[in-house]
């Protein structure tokens, strides 16, 4: 609701749900996003030892329950860096893109491995790629880049 007050354009929300944590929140977060955001991108957020595709499926069910239409009003993009770039590509100049969930955190857990990750750096890298900036930071590595 606060984001809606910041723009006359669309609100594009990007977020995931951590593995082995708050399973009951997954559907709820996607339901709320389907109701309040214009577009939603579901992605990785510390899946740990859970299947990322299963986490995203649970979230997608919540979006669908509230009228979300896959590949029209919401998308699943496993790689968080590519998800950020995709959200930027969806945006028009007057839209707002919210990259939610990781905040100040400095890593992302896949399996039992913590990979260095910073949403701020990843967003700068995605913006650099989107805008064709030569000296933009490199996108941090995640194992989902290998798919």
What spans do the regions from the language model cover?
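ATP-dependent carboxylate-amine ligase
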Residues: 1-147
